[in-house]
Structure formats: structure tokens, C-alpha cells
Amino acid sequence: MDDVQFSEGVIDNGRFGTRTIRFETGRLARQAQGSVVAYLDGETMLLSSTSVGKQPKEDCDFFPLTVDVEERSYAAGKIPGSYFRREGRPSTEAILACRLIDRPLRPSFNAGLRNEVQVIVTVLSIAPGEFYEALAINAASASTLVSGLPFSGPIGGVRLALIDGQWVAFPRYEDLSGAVFDLTVAGRVFVNESGKEDIAIMMVEAEATESAWDLIHSHGAKKPNEEVIEEGIESAKVFIRTLCDIQRDLASKLSLSHTEPDLYPDYSDSVHSFVEGLVKSDLEKVYRGNHDSGYAPNALSASDEIKQKAYDAFHDAVLSGRFDQDSLSQFPHAYKAVLKDVVRTCVLEGFARMDGRGLSDIRPLDAEVQVVPRVHGSAVFQRGETQVLGVTTLNMLKMEQQIDSLAPIVSKRYIHHYNFPPYSTGEVGRVGSPKRREIGHGFLAERALVPVLPSREDFPYAIRQVSEALGSNGSTSMGSVCASTLSLLNAGVPLRAPVAGIAMGLISGRVDGEMRYVTLTDISGSEDALGDMDFKVAGTSDFITALQLDTKLDGIPAHVLSEALAHARSARLAILDVLTRVIDSPDQMSEYAPRVVRVKIPVQKIGELIGPKGKVINSIQDETGAEISIEDDGTVYIGSSQADSSEKAVAMVNSIVNPVEPCVGSQFLGTVVKNMPFGSFISLVPGKDGLLHISEIRKMVDGRHLESVDEVLSVGQKVLVEVSKIDDRGKLCLVAVK
């Protein structure tokens, strides 16, 4: 095709090699307003399309952007494992990729846009061991850039791994085994106040790797502390600039027809001025008056009263004809704008926050363990009005989650689920399958805890952790981290270190001509909505285990980010102190939890342990009540909630692996496994049976005549026997021992 255009660039990782990024347009999906094919080293291939509705969406007071990621099984040379052999609902990995794309993309569109915009990223091909999420951010940005929509991109997204002290861009799965930290950053190029181009960080998603603890404590790797994270974000800026330049080069080769959809502001200037006159002075009295009052969570009710009175007055103005009827829908937005201005000004000028706290104050903390009977572990963590219940369930490793997606990871033994019922905010709403937000929050909490989990060898259990958000007013995800630490310890999980999390906020603005940045610790839901940043940080007392940053600013100065990380560390240590006062070491495992024992057998003995059609292993499970799973390397996991069942199963497994070879004269308490007209077959040890002839059975009843051996012995009955003879073929002849 003659009109195909492309642009490519090289990401230089020094001694770790290079990665080639290529964007192409004009060949595929030509009906979409914007479509781009993105390549990573020529083998991983994504198609991103951006489409826009022709008319504004009716009765919509928000920007209707939808981001979807379509994973195709053929991309990895697979056929779907479902009944219909067709892709179904998106995988968790695809949903998380959608969130990674949406978070930097959404604030880059013009405010007031009401036309539906849909971005679909389809994974067409993926090389083994590759991740596609960071490439998808760039592909979505590029297709939106060439669509002609009002968009302040391009946006560059890069994934970095800290390996041997170097930040490596676009790492492969195999690289992460030697990495301490995994960091995904998105940003865009903007012109700063000095007129120079700079990189605005818009989104950060990061975690310590599963191998981080061993690398740090056994191999001397650098701890991912606050300073190291800052270095990583700064390193990302170089790669983001390169990725943005490639996208801009592609756009410069096209004759773009810019689409200018109508913009619908949330409120008119006249409505804003009227509402401001009604409420501003009263709101200032409320929030400036909080300066000396200390923490007062009920102070927000005063602003609710002000809002209701203002609405009544505005409604009267509509009835009098000063404003038209449609203006009523503008009131909530205008009120929020005035409230936002008042709250931000109060903070910037040194007054108290919305609830009366100081800038670095944490809301009252409370924690308790063992709150739910019969479960394996449970805890409640409360911070202000945010309350989270954590519940832990343990099981055998065969219950670990099997992952059927394009991700290189095929299974995981730690599963974290997060639930956000509508009553947590005092509302009525739908319940059912988890929404994207719930999946994202659960995954963030999961990543915060994975680095401190014991190894499979030290703790051979699958772990399911559930976080129930019972009350929400700011950062239930970080509350989930704290509740989970308590719950896991209560369940007897030997965590390498306790983990706590905190959400930080930021207010920025000019005061007397000077630009000020004020960091807020432990932000409430309102401060999250009215502020400039949502910065969640989780970690141990030594290093950061997970981090998530979203900002509405063009960029966060390095010193502001450094200050936020320092305040987050102080808050994290304070919360950890509360957690360790409640529980500082693993409790005894619950009597209801399975006890899992690990036994190692030679690989060549696996078939013997399983037996023909599973006969041997099933007989052990039936007889002992224990569950048994066998790994390919000969590791056998035996689990039961009753210790004697596990011990009996271990003994039976060992008798197969290291069998006691029957010899003439040896005695066994055997089990009748089959009755025949000529006698009974007795199982001596797993895999070794002998024949107790009917003539010997008659001796057990003083020689009387038997119509059937069933008159004396039944299947499953225990009988003491002695080996009397072993023939040339190894067959065992038995006699009963009185």
C-alpha cells in the first residue's frame, strides 16, 4: 500500500542490548479515525484503533472514554481452552492493561468532550517471554494522536526493571528473575515555565519483584528505597522522550484532518459566579475555622448544609427565570468547583485540611485480629472512616491459580481479591462480578505483599487473601495491605516482614505570585477528588514493595516527589508500629487449616506412586483422608486438617519409595483388597500383594468347610499374616497368624 507510513526508534539499554520500537499506520483498520500498528523488535505486534462517536452522548456529564484490550490466543500460537474454543471475557492481565492505558490517556483529552471515544488495542502477536502492556500505552497514544481528536499527547509509556543497579527498559520475563524492582511509567513532553521541553510524569505503577528479598539479603542487591525509586522515575524520562518523538515523527508524515467536537463545559460562568456568591464565604468560615479544631470527621456535614441551602436558593433563581431549567444540572459541578478552590486555598495558605488535620497527620488507627470464626486467618484494619476486613484461606499448592492468558506467568500461589460493596460508602448499588477498579485494587495489594511471602519450599501452601472494604473514605487499597498483613500473620503465614501502605496527596497553586506545592498525608476521598495527585506507597520498614501514582499536573518537580516519598515513609513506619503492636509474629495455624507436608521422591518412582489409572495414590487418599499432589520434579505435597491423616499418608508414600521388601517369615498387618473363590489377596505395603489361600483361611475357623471366603474375610478388613513362600516369579504366599 502506497500510503503506509512508519516511524521507528531504538531503546538503548547499554550492556543489556537494544529494543526497537516501530509504529506504522495506513495498512490495517483504515476505517477507524485513527489506527496504528506497534511493534517491539518485529515479533510483538499490537493493533490500536481510536474511534469517536459522531454525536455527543445524551444526558452525559462526564467524558465517555472506553479502553479495551483484546488478547488473541493466536498471538501466542494457542487455541483457547474454553468449550467453544473462542476467547471469552478479558483476562485479569488484559483488564490491568486497560487501566494502565486509561489512566494517562483520559486526562489528556480536552475538558467538556462528550462524544464517545473508544480505544481498542488488539494483541496480534507476542514473542515468548515478552510483556505487551507498556507497548500498548504507546500504541493507544499513537492511534489517538493520528485520529485528529483534541488530544494533548503523545504519551510515552515504558516498563523498567532494576537489574544489577541499572534500569533496563522493556525487560523480558526472564530478566525479572534478576531484578529487584519493576516500574512502569507514562508521561508526555510539555513546555515548562522556562520555555524548555520537559517530561510530565502522568502515571507510575511499580512493585518489588518476587525475588527482591533474596536478591537484597543474599546477594547484596540495592534496596528499592525512596531514593532508588526517584532515580527510576528520572531514568524513565529519557525513554519516554524517545517514544514520544517516534510518535510525533509518525504524525508529522500524515495530513491529519483535525476533528473539533463541540465541548460542553460542566457549568456556565454565570452559574459559577452565582453559586460562588452563595457559598464561598460560608465555606471559608468552615474550613479556615478548622485550623485549631484538630481532627473532626463530622466537619464535612457543615458543608453539606451549606450546599443544600445554596441549592434551594439556586432552584428559586431558576423558578424566577434568572436561569433556565437545564441549569439545575450545572449546580453540583459549579458547587464542586467553588469548594475545590476554597479547600485548596486554605491548604496553600497554611490553614487546616477539610477535616481539621495537619498536613502530615494520619487519621486515628485501629486494628484487630481473629475477628471471624473458623476461617484460617482474619483481621480488621481501620483508618478514620476507612475500614477493611482481611480474610486468609490456605490450601494445597494444587489449588494455586492457573493463568490462561498471553502473560508469561502461567500460575500463582498468592491470590488477592478485593471487594467494594456499595454499603461501604453508604450507598445503594449493583453487586456481582468485580469491576475493573476492584480488580486493579486487589492487584495493587497483591503486589505489595508478594515480595515478603515465604518461599514455596518454606511454606508449601496456596494462599487466597480477600479484602472486604466495609467502609470507604480514602485509600481502601492501602487499608487492604494493612489488613492483609495482620490476617496473614494471624493465619500463621511466616511473612519475611510486615507491610503497610499509605496514600499521599498534593495541592499546588500560586500564592502571592509564588508556586507552592503542599503534600498531604493519608488523603480522604474528598481530598483525592479535589487534589492534584493520588500517590499510594506500600512497603516494609526497609524498602518499598509497591507504588502507584496518578497526577493531574503537567509534571511533579523532583523535590516535591522526594518530599512526598519521605512523608509516606514516616507514615508507613507509624502504621507499621500499630500493626506490630497487634501481632508481631505468625500465630499458630488454625485447627481448620490443612497441614501440608512435603516429601521428596525419586522421579522414577512417580509412576509407581500413582499406580495404574491412579489406583495407588487414590487408595492412599481414600484410606487416610489426606490430599496428595505430585510435582514433575518428584516433590509430593500431602495435606490434611488432621495431623494423624498426614502422618499416615507420609508413611504410606515412604513405604512405596523405600519399600520394605517382604521376605519369608516377615509379618504384616495387611488389608484384604480382593476375594476370589480360591482365596483372598492381601495388600502388605502399597504395590505388594500376597495370596492367602482358602486352605489357610479355613484354619482361621478351625478347619470347617467354607462355601466362600467372604464368610470369614471382607474387603477392607485388616488381617495379620506372615510370608510363607516366595515363588520364582516373586508371588507371595501367606499364612494367617493367630
From Swiss-Prot:
Coiled coil: none annotated. This is Polyribonucleotide nucleotidyltransferase. Its EC number is 2.7.7.8. GO terms for biological process: mRNA catabolic process; RNA processing. Keywords: Cytoplasm, Magnesium, Metal-binding, Nucleotidyltransferase, RNA-binding, Transferase. GO terms for molecular function: 3'-5'-RNA exonuclease activity; magnesium ion binding; polyribonucleotide nucleotidyltransferase activity; RNA binding. NCBIfam families: polynuc_phos (TIGR03591), pppGpp_PNP (TIGR02696), PRK11824.1 (NF008805). Involved in mRNA degradation. Catalyzes the phosphorolysis of single-stranded polyribonucleotides processively in the 3'- to 5'-direction. It comes from the Bacteria. Its cofactor is Mg(2+). InterPro entries: ExoRNase_PH_dom1, ExoRNase_PH_dom2, ExoRNase_PH_dom2_sf, GPSI/PNP, KH_dom, KH_dom_type_1, KH_dom_type_1_sf, NA-bd_OB-fold. It is an enzyme of class 2 (transferase). The gene is pnp. It is found in: Cytoplasm. Residues 665-737 form the S1 motif domain. PANTHER family: POLYRIBONUCLEOTIDE NUCLEOTIDYLTRANSFERASE, POLYRIBONUCLEOTIDE NUCLEOTIDYLTRANSFERASE 1, MITOCHONDRIAL. Pfam families: KH_1, RNase_PH, RNase_PH_C, S1.
